């Protein structure tokens, strides 16, 4: 469950940074890509927990 909560928090942060990126903030795009990579790793962990 802890992994799922972390994913929810990362998704909220990703949403904020993605919105900022589309408004022209290029550094928010970098943060969004970093968050995407973190989410990918957490999703792999969650997948392992489910199996």
Question: Which functions belong to the PLM regions below?
Answer:
Residues 29-37:
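Short, charged, amphipathic alpha-helical segments
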Residues 3-4, 9-19, 34, 41-51:
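Polytopic transmembrane helical bundles with strong interfacial aromatic enrichment
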Residues 22, 26-30:
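Short, surface-exposed loop/turn segments at secondary-structure junctions
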